[in-house]
Curated annotation (Swiss-Prot):
Belongs to the bacterial/plant glucose-1-phosphate adenylyltransferase family. The lineage of its organism: Bacteria, Pseudomonadati, Pseudomonadota, Alphaproteobacteria, Hyphomicrobiales. The gene is glgC. Pfam families: Hexapep_GlmU, NTP_transferase. This is Glucose-1-phosphate adenylyltransferase. It catalyses: alpha-D-glucose 1-phosphate + ATP + H(+) = ADP-alpha-D-glucose + diphosphate. It comes from Rhizobium meliloti (strain 1021) (Ensifer meliloti). Involved in the biosynthesis of ADP-glucose, a building block required for the elongation reactions to produce glycogen. Catalyzes the reaction between ATP and alpha-D-glucose 1-phosphate (G1P) to produce pyrophosphate and ADP-Glc.
Amino acid sequence: MVEKRTQPLARDAMAYVLAGGRGSRLKELTDRRAKPAVYFGGKARIIDFALSNALNSGIRRIGVATQYKAHSLIRHLQRGWNFFRPERNESFDILPASQRVSETQWYEGTADAVYQNIDIIEDHGVEYMVILAGDHVYKMDYELMLQQHVDSGADVTVGCLEVPRMEATGFGVMHVDNADRIIAFVEKPADPPGIPGNPDMALASMGIYVFHTKFLMDMLRRDAADPKSSRDFGKDIIPYIVEHGKAVAHRFTHSCVRSDFEREAYWRDVGTIDAYWQANIDLTHITPELDIYDSTWPIWTFSEIKPPAKFVHDDENRRGSATSSLVSGDCIISGAALNRSLLFTGVRVNSYSRLENAVVLPDVTIGRHSILRNVVIDSRVVIPEGLVVGDDPELDAKRFRRTESGVCLITQTMIDKLGM
């Protein structure tokens, strides 16, 4: 007889978010911040999606492991995620790489980032561990994954989704049987195996793992004692369990959270400039693929106390306006025109300028008579008067980071070199 559950499994779980990665494919956008700390969607940071999923799923104990250029990430977590209360049996731990196990080692891999804090985890006394990547954009109910983990009797449950086969080189790729038990797992293969019967697609790991806590601690201690291990979940821990235990796949379509008009299960890596730009610009559509307005599954973040956005001037050639755009608080659009653009907090766009398909990070100032198309502008950049981007591909490529699809990343260092 199956024991009846009296409370959600999430109440006896800890979410452990791996947030130490650089995200080198985002180029200069991660020169000063880790990928999980990169801004997204007008207000949030990328890490807020994994954290919000945990909170909305009912998890009240969260740990975040940080490493690469962590200052802005730690500051964001301290300001935006400081509402957990011990008296309510809640906790939020920020766990920077601090050589707690060895005086000579930082986090050596994803598994080591958990192992080095094993005493903190055990002090929480939770039954389940939900290991999360902090650098993906998606909405997911982890309670449903926890339920499958318990019901299946798995040693580990791995979140997965189908992706085009040749896009799976950056993920762990698995084969499963008819019951979704994982029978083979390879990390970041150069030639990913396709799904039987659907060879153009591969079943990719989302970097989400559910364990019973005691089993995970045993696995981490065994792995730490292995001199040949690379201390990584995808390379070491998961393949070992596939071979010696029971690993089960959890399909993202079974637990993704969708509002009424979200047609497909939405998950994005946003690991390249093109992918980052596209995911942000998609939010300007009438019915975007990701609904950030879904009040039943809010994306929690740090909300600054800022005045509303303001649009000024209404002359024939000098009108502050925005079409199909997201404009955050404390922005002033002074006689400029925006189309299909997303502006974060504190942006100033001065007269006679035009922005189209622009993603503008916080506290940017755009000078008069500027024309900016298909751009990502890093925070605190000052765009000089009369700058034109998006008309001359060769000139853009000489001055800025231009992708093959024509998106330009603009940083202050690049602007300074122009001498304008």
